[in-house]
């Protein structure tokens, strides 16, 4: 009988005769779609934080062979897989698309060709099933993923580290961000990937199928970082901005020197790759930790985060790196703060974080479009209000960091 009533309710809703809320108070449900870079993700999540269904197609193996992400190739792969991925997530959830409360999709920032695939597909669904559309800022979604798992209250400090971004910000609300600092050139994930390619780690027997960042972390476990002396970027700049291009240039010079010493040609594996990996990882970790430490000092001084029970959230693909987490744990321990990171599978791009961000926006009534005409994607997009210049003018000195063992 219950199943029969449920089916009648669904039919009534589908036919538009009554609303779900008229029948029974069901939790709202959002379908999230992610195609900003090289992962095609979809998930169905309800407002209780239950992941009803999810699916992901990763393009990593293909891009490893081409030596990096080629936008046209990524676009083609998204087109080939998006229908299958979305259908798999919906099927796993056990619900009908008519039961969705809204459809949320990444529209910024990212690779334009890839964003376009997700947006076009989503708008087709929106029109077919007559659902509200929720455009999602990719980095906002990363920042709020932790709230799916932990009752983190606003405001909190967030460090977003990935292959495309490096941002320190205060999160004051679902769509309220204040940026303290960002990368002036490339992102840490991009740097680690490029170093891995320069070291030809794709040819290392222990690194088969690993991304550049994964290979660096794996080899660093057995390396001696003290063999290669690398300078921490921007040590004399008392702000919260980041720079990684100079570090990569340092590493390239070290590699060239080692190749000359060993008589090894470019493209061949050096015997000291683990040492170089350990040195690079350590330097990236210290750079991130020092800037984060300054951000904490600044925020507490200015009353931007609570003085007690304050929280640092770290998210994005690079947040999966355990050594970098350890460095940041050192900072939060000394500052009497809690460090929270989503599990690795939710740090990298996925549909769950998009669906959850859609739920949060739906609950707060922010950014929900009942008419999606004119919805568009943006390859570049800022994150909230930028006060990085105020942080620079504060010129806060930080203490040297020793990563806890």
From Swiss-Prot:
Gene3D superfamilies: 3.30.420.40. Its cofactor is a divalent metal cation. Its EC number is 2.3.1.234. Substrate binds at residues 160-164, 193, 213, 217, 320-321, 348. Transmembrane segments: none annotated. A divalent metal cation binds at residues 138, 142, 349. It holds the Pfam family TsaD. Binds 1 divalent metal cation per subunit. SUPFAM superfamilies: Actin-like ATPase domain. It catalyses: L-threonylcarbamoyladenylate + adenosine(37) in tRNA = N(6)-L-threonylcarbamoyladenosine(37) in tRNA + AMP + H(+). Residues 1-19 form a transit peptide. Belongs to the KAE1 / TsaD family. Monomer. HAMAP family: TsaD. This is tRNA N6-adenosine threonylcarbamoyltransferase, mitochondrial. It comes from Xenopus tropicalis (Western clawed frog). The gene is osgepl1.
């Amino acid at each position: 009988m219950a199943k029969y009533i449920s089916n009648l309710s669904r039919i009534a809703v589908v036919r538009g005769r009554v609303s779900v809320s008229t029948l029974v108070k069901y939790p709202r449900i959002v379908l999230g779609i992610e195609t900003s870079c090289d992962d095609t993700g979809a998930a169905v999540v309800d407002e209780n934080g239950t992941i009803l269904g999810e699916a992901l197609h990763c393009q990593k193996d293909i891009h490893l062979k081409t030596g990096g992400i080629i936008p046209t190739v990524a676009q083609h792969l998204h087109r080939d897989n998006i229908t299958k991925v979305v259908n798999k997530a919906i099927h796993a959830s056990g619900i009908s698309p008519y039961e969705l409360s809204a459809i949320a999709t990444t529209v910024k920032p990212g690779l334009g060709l890839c964003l376009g695939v997700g947006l076009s597909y989503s708008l087709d669904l929106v029109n077919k099933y007559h659902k509200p559309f929720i455009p999602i800022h990719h980095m906002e979604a990363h920042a709020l993923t932790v709230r799916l798992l932990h009752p983190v209250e606003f405001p909190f400090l967030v460090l977003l580290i990935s292959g495309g971004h490096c941002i320190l910000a205060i999160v004051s609300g679902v769509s309220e961000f204040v940026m303290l600092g960002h990368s002036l050139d490339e992102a840490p994930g991009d740097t680690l990937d490029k170093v891995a390619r320069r070291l030809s780690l794709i040819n290392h027997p222990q690194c088969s199928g690993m991304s550049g960042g994964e290979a660096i972390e794996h080899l660093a476990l057995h390396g001696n970082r003290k063999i290669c002396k690398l300078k921490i970027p921007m040590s004399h700049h008392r702000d919260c901005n980041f720079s990684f291009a100079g570090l990569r240039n340092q590493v390239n010079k070290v590699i060239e020197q080692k190749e000359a010493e060993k008589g090894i040609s470019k493209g061949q594996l050096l015997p000291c790759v683990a040492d170089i990996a350990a040195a690079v990882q350590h330097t990236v970790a210290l750079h991130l930790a020092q800037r984060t430490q300054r951000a904490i000092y600044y925020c507490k001084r200015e009353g931007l985060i609570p003085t007690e029970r304050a929280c640092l959230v770290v998210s994005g693909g690079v947040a999966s790196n355990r050594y970098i987490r350890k460095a940041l744990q050192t900072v939060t321990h000394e500052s009497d703060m809690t460090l929270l990171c989503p599990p690795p599978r939710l740090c990298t791009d996925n549909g769950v974080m998009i669906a959850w961000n859609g739920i949060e926006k739906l609950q707060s009534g922010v950014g929900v479009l009942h008419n999606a005409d004119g919805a568009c994607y943006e390859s570049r997009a800022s994150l909230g209000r930028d006060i990085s210049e105020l942080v620079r003018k504060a010129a806060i000195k930080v203490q040297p960091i020793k990563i806890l063992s």
